Regions:
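SDR active-site strand-loop-helix element
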Residues: 6, 30, 59-63, 104-110, ...
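N-terminal Rossmann NAD(P)H-binding glycine-rich loop of SDR-like oxidoreductase domains
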Residues: 3-23
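Conserved glycine-rich Rossmann-like NAD(P)H-binding loop of the short-chain dehydrogenase/reductase
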Residues: 25-33
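Active-site Tyr-X1-5-Lys
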Residues: 132-165
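NAD(P)H-binding glycine-rich loop region in Rossmannoid oxidoreductase-like domains
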Residues: 35-89
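Flexible, glycine-rich beta-alpha linker
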Residues: 112-114, 161-176
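Rossmann-fold NAD(P)-dependent oxidoreductase module
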Residues: 15, 19, 93, 152
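Conserved Rossmann-fold NAD(P)-dependent oxidoreductase catalytic core, especially the SDR/UDP-sugar
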Residues: 88-139, 164
Length: 176
């Protein structure tokens, strides 16, 4: 299986690539930290990196500015644009592919859900958050980012590719 991992130079991308390669899969890492076996991209525009999407079985987009920071306007804008722009351009690459991937796994976030103790949140019954009376303002910002991120995924014109938003929470790794 050929997997293209955009934004694949971060914590999750390194672990994913290592595990997939150990299973015998071909992995193409696309990232801003070019060098070695990393195909360079800027996360905003189509470029030579997009040719790797054509003929891939799976694309995994892990790109996005780290949330490990203070949530001031500048960082929130970086979080938003790094996620929305990279998702948009991955969609453009898939749409332009003569042989598009069967699956597009798109990182998202579980912070899209409301804080609740009465029931679990999932895709079928989950309650979107950000409007809880006791919620700090930055929660709303996180939900706005997640909502626009997933909207960009949904609206990508990729009819021959199954799109999956991965609503994960914090991921820890022995690599860091």
């Amino acid at each position: 299986v050929k997997v293209v991992a955009t934004g694949g130079t971060g914590q999750l991308g390194r672990v994913l690539a290592r595990e997939l390669r150990a299973e015998g899969h071909e992995v193409v890492i696309v990232g801003r930290s070019a060098g070695g076996d990393v195909v360079p991209w800027d996360g905003r525009t189509l470029g030579p990196w997009a040719r790797h999407v054509d003929g891939a079985d799976v694309v995994v987009n892990l790109a996005g500015r780290s949330v490990n920071c203070r949530y001031h306007k500048h960082h929130l804008a970086e979080m938003m644009f790094s996620r929305v722009d990279s998702t948009r351009v991955v969609g453009e690459a898939i749409a332009a592919a003569a042989k598009p991937p069967r699956v597009w796994l798109q990182m998202s976030t579980a912070t899209i859900y409301a804080h609740r103790l009465d029931a679990p949140n999932d895709e079928g019954t989950g309650v979107l958050g950000g409007f809880e009376p006791e919620a700090p303002g930055y929660w709303r910002s996180s939900v706005d980012i997640a909502t626009q991120w997933e909207r960009t995924l949904r609206e990508a014109p990729t009819p021959n590719t199954r799109k999956i938003a991965i609503r994960s929470s914090f991921a820890m790794s022995p690599d860091r």
